[in-house]
Amino acid sequence: MKDLPIIALDFESATKVNTFLDQFDEPLFVKIGMELFYQAGPDLIKSIKSRGHDIFLDLKLHDIPNTVEKAMEGLGKLDVDLVNVHAAGGTDMMKAAVRGLHKYSNDTKIIAVTQLTSTTEEMLRNEQNIQTTIEEAVLNYATLTQQAGLDGVVCSPLEAELLTNKLGSNFLKVTPGIRPQGAAVDDQKRITTPEDAKQLGATHIVVGRPITQSENPVESYHTIKESWLG
């Protein structure tokens, strides 16, 4: 799995994805989320893999254990590099996800979403009825994730240092909410720059609109890549 900034391909069609990818002449690490996968499906996965790119298939599975296990069996056949579930689904569901994935793929990494980077502490308490700090909630979910046998979590860069200290540096910490200095915050709440994310212990960063909506996506990508890789 490449140690590159993961580009969130938040497009609604395969045509727009291919137009975007045609601008690059190097292997990338890209994220395909629900919006795109539900429109374009497995055929797009195969097309992107044929270009030599790594893929994070970001579907955030969250259902009863049996359903997630069977769904993950299907994802295991797609030869993607990274998949995920919601940690809120519980330990049994996460263990089932690992079983399903490993039935067809031992190479694909699997991680769990702790708290979305759009979540604030006020939302955590008033809407999710979780009466702890975000850091405590994320650490609890991440600990359960590690105990269930997953490879890491999706978390804010702001929690990455805590998770490294508690769960070790080999536990993946994939961090959205990355914005270069001066970029628009959009709907993210808990954000940092690429440089700060690395210093805080993130193992991978996810960047979308600052690259995909840039006037010069290739230049923006390389700027972020240089900031991330140092």
UniProtKB/Swiss-Prot annotation:
Record function comment: Catalyzes the decarboxylation of orotidine 5'-monophosphate (OMP) to uridine 5'-monophosphate (UMP).
Disulfide bonds: none
Catalytic activity: orotidine 5'-phosphate + H(+) = UMP + CO2
EC number: 4.1.1.23
Pathway this chain belongs to: Pyrimidine metabolism; UMP biosynthesis via de novo pathway; UMP from orotate: step 2/2
Presence of keyword Transcription: no
Keyword Lyase applies: yes
Listed Pfam families: OMPdecase
Catalytic residue positions: K60
Binding site for substrate: 10, 31, 58-67, 117, 179, 188, 208-209
Keyword line: Decarboxylase, Lyase, Pyrimidine biosynthesis
EC category name: lyase
Stored CDD domains: OMP_decarboxylase_like
Protein name: Orotidine 5'-phosphate decarboxylase
GO cellular component, as recorded: cytosol
GO molecular function, one term: orotidine-5'-phosphate decarboxylase activity
GO terms for biological process, alphabetical: 'de novo' pyrimidine nucleobase biosynthetic process; 'de novo' UMP biosynthetic process
Gene: pyrF
Assembly notes: Homodimer.
Protein family per UniProt: Belongs to the OMP decarboxylase family. Type 1 subfamily.
InterPro entries membership: Aldolase_TIM (IPR013785), OMPdecase (IPR014732), OMPdecase_AS (IPR018089), OMPdecase_bac (IPR047596), OMPdeCOase_dom (IPR001754), RibuloseP-bd_barrel (IPR011060)
